[in-house]
């Protein structure tokens, strides 16, 4: 379970980063 939870957090953080990058590109 701890590993699965950790992976989920990492994936969530990655998705958040992609959203920020996408918005940054759109702003440009």
Curated annotation (Swiss-Prot):
Temperature impact on function: Moderately thermostable. Has a 1.5 hour half-life at 55 degrees Celsius.
Record Gene3D superfamilies: FAD/NAD(P)-binding domain
Source organism, top-level taxon: Eukaryota
Keyword Flavoprotein on entry: yes
Key words of the record: FAD, Flavoprotein, Lignin degradation, Oxidoreductase
Keyword Flavoprotein: yes
EC number(s) given by UniProt: 1.1.3.-
GO molecular function: oxidoreductase activity
InterPro entries: FAD/NAD-bd_sf (IPR036188)
Biological role: Plays a central role in the biodegradation of lignin. Oxidizes veratryl alcohol to veratraldehyde reducing O(2) to H(2)O(2).
Listed name of the protein: Veratryl alcohol oxidase
